[in-house]
Amino acid sequence: MIDLRSDTVTRPTPPMLAAMSAAEVGDDVWGDDPTVLRLQATLAERTGKEAGLFFPSGTQSNLAALMAHCARGDEYIVGQLAHTYKYEGGGAAVLGSIQPQPLENAADGSIPLDKIAAAIKPIDDHFARTRLVALENTIGGKVLPAQYVADATQLARERGLATHLDGARVFNAAVASGKPVAALAEPFDSVSICFSKGLGAPVGSVLVGSRALIDVAHRWRKVLGGGMRQAGVLAAACLYALDHNVERLADDHANAAHLAAGLETIEQVKVQSLATNMVFAQFPQQHCAPLEAWLKERGILTQMLYASRFVTHMDVSSDDIDSFIDAVKGYFAAR
């Protein structure tokens, strides 16, 4: 089966499963799982932060970060297309009583600085207190421009705001930009990094930041139900991914470029964008449902919409991309 719906569909490789099976474990709620401790320390060092905290999901990692930065009735500034705002169930508002202030994203995924500045509320009892600016990198596959990140985080600091990065795919950004992940993490007070996407682990995200922030997030993790017992089995997969699956993300980026080039040869398809491991393309609306069914019959899973996203990952080869392109061509040729 060729699955282009997301990079969340990656499956553990036999060597990763072996690492999980051999993991030394303890009880992480008691803080004595050695493999979890090693993962947290390793990622903190790699990102240049003081401490890390292992979570079962990126949604929970992001939420704990927002709740560590903001109190009830506070506000965070975020892009309208950001995962923390649009795709995490409204958790900041529902569970954290944190008001989002969504702003329109620019085409490159950034939030214009003048809009951020204008959205910061004055100190007045009528307003929620603006406490945080949250960015995402990559966002829609796009790597945020380094100068923009520097300017946005500087603006936040000057206005007394904290900064959080949803870095679910920050290793994709690092590979694409040629910058170490520590350089991408450095401007932010906290960063959430996911291991169950392109890095290929089955479960897990790590939040990194200052020791004081992680101590607060640790309590919120418990409140949110994220405390796990013998979690070293999962942490071992993440450690394996750090050692073996980072540099190979370049292969996913190359396969995405290959996929985009193939779609561009099909008259009925309009490629909108290509960035890291994601391709966005438009298909005639009337063909989306039948094309998705056609592809599934041929062992290819997609989510066909008028504006469709295709995501490459470690379980998709260059030959698989060729099979996908041939199948799409075959569909339109039969019409």
Language-model features: where?
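Conserved PLP-enzyme active-site core in the AAT-like
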Residues: 2-293, 298-316, 324-331, 335
